[in-house]
């Protein structure tokens, strides 16, 4: 009876952790979606086709092995106090990407055997616009990263966009 109670308790606590992790991810997504398309008033960067504020690429779901991909682009400014007056501000763009790949997490089944879970892990990348190459890149400074796992064990990630009138797009 102890084993049954212990297994039930573990399942309940695991579900609570998953639920909290999901809420944390949604909060993070909301903060970044609010930044989409932001530009400073004096921003002098030329617009580019890669600077789409929000871009959603539809996935095929768990059966197809892919989930939706979300790209968010927003403006920022780098300040250099040692630069000459009038050249201290350099405007830039950041691209945040959320994407999925098959999870590699292994779970232990009630009979003691192990199997890889049937789900995705969510990866996040943060890239900065490189004016010299006209592409988003990592490695330009230590705040950038590529495909860092933010959440494991997700059944699917689906984004449903709406227009200004509340009608579903796509």
What positions do the PLM features span?
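Cell-surface, membrane-associated systems
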Residues: 41-170
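Aliphatic-rich helix starts adjacent to a transmembrane/signal segment
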Residues: 1-40
